[in-house]
Amino acid sequence: MSVNIRSLRHLLGWLIAGTRGGPTRARIIENLKETPQNANQLATSMKLDYKTVRHHLTVLEKNRIISSIGDKYGASYFLSQMMEENYVLFEEILNKLWKK
Protein backbone atom coordinates (compact mmCIF):
# COMPACT_ATOMS: atom_id res chain seq x y z
CA MET A 1 0.00 0.00 0.00
CA SER A 2 1.52 3.29 -1.08
CA VAL A 3 1.14 6.08 1.43
CA ASN A 4 2.46 9.61 1.52
CA ILE A 5 4.66 9.55 4.62
CA ARG A 6 4.42 13.30 5.11
CA SER A 7 0.62 13.23 5.01
CA LEU A 8 0.53 10.32 7.45
CA ARG A 9 2.92 12.13 9.80
CA HIS A 10 0.63 15.19 9.75
CA LEU A 11 -2.47 13.05 10.28
CA LEU A 12 -0.95 11.18 13.21
CA GLY A 13 0.37 14.41 14.67
CA TRP A 14 -3.11 15.92 14.55
CA LEU A 15 -4.85 12.80 15.91
CA ILE A 16 -2.36 12.34 18.75
CA ALA A 17 -0.87 15.75 19.59
CA GLY A 18 -3.34 18.19 18.10
CA THR A 19 -6.58 17.17 19.77
CA ARG A 20 -7.81 16.80 23.34
CA GLY A 21 -8.42 13.06 22.89
CA GLY A 22 -4.96 12.41 21.50
CA PRO A 23 -3.49 10.67 24.55
CA THR A 24 -6.43 8.26 24.69
CA ARG A 25 -6.13 7.52 20.97
CA ALA A 26 -2.41 6.86 21.43
CA ARG A 27 -3.17 4.36 24.20
CA ILE A 28 -5.74 2.63 21.99
CA ILE A 29 -3.24 2.36 19.13
CA GLU A 30 -0.64 0.90 21.50
CA ASN A 31 -3.16 -1.62 22.85
CA LEU A 32 -4.23 -2.69 19.37
CA LYS A 33 -0.60 -3.09 18.31
CA GLU A 34 -0.35 -5.83 20.94
CA THR A 35 -3.57 -7.67 20.10
CA PRO A 36 -6.88 -7.08 18.28
CA GLN A 37 -9.70 -6.30 20.70
CA ASN A 38 -13.33 -5.24 20.70
CA ALA A 39 -14.53 -1.97 22.25
CA ASN A 40 -15.61 -3.62 25.49
CA GLN A 41 -12.25 -5.33 25.96
CA LEU A 42 -10.44 -2.03 25.35
CA ALA A 43 -12.72 -0.14 27.74
CA THR A 44 -12.15 -2.73 30.46
CA SER A 45 -8.38 -3.01 30.05
CA MET A 46 -7.92 0.76 29.76
CA LYS A 47 -10.40 1.55 32.55
CA LEU A 48 -12.37 3.92 30.29
CA ASP A 49 -16.05 4.40 29.60
CA TYR A 50 -17.31 2.20 26.76
CA LYS A 51 -18.78 5.19 24.86
CA THR A 52 -15.48 7.05 25.10
CA VAL A 53 -13.65 4.10 23.57
CA ARG A 54 -16.29 3.76 20.83
CA HIS A 55 -15.87 7.45 19.94
CA HIS A 56 -12.09 7.14 19.61
CA LEU A 57 -12.37 3.91 17.62
CA THR A 58 -14.71 5.68 15.19
CA VAL A 59 -12.25 8.57 14.76
CA LEU A 60 -9.32 6.20 14.22
CA GLU A 61 -11.25 4.02 11.77
CA LYS A 62 -12.49 7.00 9.74
CA ASN A 63 -8.87 8.10 9.39
CA ARG A 64 -7.75 4.60 8.35
CA ILE A 65 -5.47 4.13 11.34
CA ILE A 66 -7.38 1.04 12.44
CA SER A 67 -9.65 -1.49 10.74
CA SER A 68 -12.39 -3.72 12.06
CA ILE A 69 -13.92 -7.11 11.41
CA GLY A 70 -17.38 -8.05 12.57
CA ASP A 71 -20.56 -6.20 13.39
CA LYS A 72 -21.39 -3.61 16.03
CA TYR A 73 -20.77 -4.85 19.58
CA GLY A 74 -18.61 -7.81 18.64
CA ALA A 75 -16.42 -6.02 16.10
CA SER A 76 -12.72 -6.62 16.63
CA TYR A 77 -10.36 -3.75 15.93
CA PHE A 78 -6.75 -3.95 14.81
CA LEU A 79 -4.17 -1.66 13.23
CA SER A 80 -4.66 -1.05 9.53
CA GLN A 81 -2.02 -2.32 7.14
CA MET A 82 -0.93 1.29 6.54
CA MET A 83 -0.45 1.83 10.27
CA GLU A 84 1.38 -1.47 10.74
CA GLU A 85 3.77 -0.58 7.93
CA ASN A 86 4.38 2.92 9.31
CA TYR A 87 4.19 2.33 13.07
CA VAL A 88 7.62 3.91 13.47
CA LEU A 89 6.07 7.30 12.59
CA PHE A 90 3.65 6.92 15.49
CA GLU A 91 6.54 6.05 17.82
CA GLU A 92 8.48 9.12 16.61
CA ILE A 93 5.52 11.38 17.40
CA LEU A 94 5.14 9.87 20.88
CA ASN A 95 8.86 10.25 21.56
CA LYS A 96 8.75 13.94 20.58
CA LEU A 97 5.74 14.53 22.83
CA TRP A 98 7.29 12.80 25.82
CA LYS A 99 10.57 14.73 25.47
CA LYS A 100 8.78 18.09 25.80
What are these regions (language model features)?
Residues 64:
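Glycine-centered, phosphate/nucleic-acid-interacting loop/turn motifs that mediate DNA/RNA or nucleotide
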Residues 11, 75-100:
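Conserved segment of winged-helix/HTH DNA-binding domains
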Residues 23, 34-38:
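Short capping segments at the starts of secondary-structure elements
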Residues 1-26:
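Short alpha-helical segments that sit at the start of domains
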Residues 41-45:
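A short acidic, leucine-rich amphipathic alpha-helix
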Residues 26-32:
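Hydrophobic residues on short alpha-helical segments
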